[in-house]
């Protein structure tokens, strides 16, 4: 039996933003907004490039992420069960 790894929507979203160099606005829970491009991410953090400065942002501090242009998903990238 082959196990199919189900992709996480959050990972797909951030990876598409990173690969396509789409600028995003990160809204933090304290009200601050950060605009930049995703350089990398893991389960707990996002690295954002803001004006040639890298910022390590903890995901628990993020309220919302808004892309400056739509991020497209392939039909088979995310499936709900």
From Swiss-Prot:
Sm domain residues: 11-71
Single biological process term from Gene Ontology: regulation of translation, ncRNA-mediated
Family annotation (InterPro entries): Hfq, LSM_dom_sf, Sm
Keywords: RNA-binding, Stress response
Keyword Disulfide bond among UniProt keywords: no
SUPFAM superfamilies assigned: Sm-like ribonucleoproteins
GO cellular component, one term: cytosol
KW Metal-binding (keyword) present: no
GO molecular function: RNA binding
Taxonomy, superkingdom: Bacteria
Oligomer status and interactors: Homohexamer.
Primary role: RNA chaperone that binds small regulatory RNA (sRNAs) and mRNAs to facilitate mRNA translational regulation in response to envelope stress, environmental stress and changes in metabolite concentrations. Also binds with high specificity to tRNAs.
HAMAP family: Hfq
Entries under NCBIfam families matching the protein: Hfq, PRK00395.1
Family that this chain belongs to: Belongs to the Hfq family.
Protein name: RNA-binding protein Hfq
The gene coding this protein: hfq
